[in-house]
Amino acid sequence: MRAVLDTNIYVDFASGKLDVVNLLAIQSTEILLPAIVMGELFYGFIKGSRTRYNEEKFHHFVSTLDVYFIHVNEHVARKYAIIFSALTNNGTRIPINDVWIAACCMSVGGTLLTRDRHFEQVSQIDKIILP
């Protein structure tokens, strides 16, 4: 599985939550991280009291597990437009960053790993929503 991580999944992994650690270890052939998730993580690191520690832990995660980054480009922007249009047509609203995360996932044909149930509304992507 090409696992595209949502912010909450990285946080759970970094905290050592076994369901996430096992899922990534057993089922993932590739781990991908959208640029938007990196932005959310760095924001959290800056807001917290252990900025340097959290950044070092993140960089260790990226280098140890050979994580690939999904950058926002024209291809991702087009996927964003498709997803956002479908959500709007259905009268559905989800956080805008999550539309971008879904677009990143769609652009690489990955499976989004998340704990956010509102991704159930995004039919264009494969997803695993953990409890």
Question: How would you name each of these model-derived features?
Answer:
Residues 30, 66-68, 126:
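Conserved beta-strand segments of alpha/beta enzyme cores
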Residues 48-52, 87-88, 129-131:
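Short, hinge-like loop/turn segments at secondary-structure boundaries
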Residues 6-7, 41, 80, 105:
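Generic structural signal for small/hydrophobic residues in well-ordered secondary structure
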Residues 10, 38-41, 119-120:
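A generic structural signal for short hydrophobic patches within well-formed alpha-helices
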Residues 1, 102, 106-131:
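Acidic, PIN/NYN-like endoribonuclease modules and their adjacent C-terminal/linker elements
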